[in-house]
Amino acid sequence: GCQPHSRILRVELELGGHEVSQADLTRVFERSHNEQLQQDRMFLHGLPVGYEIDGLHGIQDPRGMRGEKLLVRMHVVSGCRSTIRNLTNCVGRCHLDTDELVLSSYASGLASLVEDELDLGAICIDMGAGVTSIAVFRNNAMMHADAVPVGGWHVTSDIARGLDTSMRDAERLKTLFGSTIASDVDKKDMIDVPPLGERDASGPNH
């Protein structure tokens, strides 16, 4: 993965009593985009997660409101620069252009969560082969993002090692019998686990 780094940035803007305009919000977003990052990091997202005007909290959209000071909490997400460049280079070699970069867990959350889940709060877990990414949503905004270098391949590998079977058979067992939800499975149930190096099993052995 791109090793996402997630943090909340507070951006203040002096209003001088005038109404908040779209131009003001654009200035705030530009400031978050220009936030100094480490040399090996690349900016991915700058997403507003909360607005305040003169200490007033809970504002969903400040446009048209008056005040002296606007405070915007921005969720800034960055990724590993070298990994992102390798991905864009790979896309370029396929004679395709990269229009925009989107964190996979963020895209998965927007695609799979319903409006109430985004508003009330939910965590989207996107498990790939080697990386599992998460995105935390609340109040219709992504509040946090992270990733761990563990995925479905590691589960398959553990099954293969634990049952002394091949990776191919372990993947099949995971697909047919695996579940992330605990259930009352009869402990007397048996499944066929082909021994490592043997293709024909005489009967259920686990």
State each model region's role.
Residues 1, 124-131, 137-140, 149-153:
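A short acidic Gly-Thr/Ser loop motif
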Residues 1-123, 142-143, 165-168, 172-206:
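Nucleotide/phosphate-binding catalytic cleft detector across ATP-hydrolyzing
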Residues 145-147:
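Residue-level detector of high-confidence beta-strand sites
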Residues 149-169:
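A conserved active-site cap/scaffold subdomain adjacent to cofactor or substrate pockets
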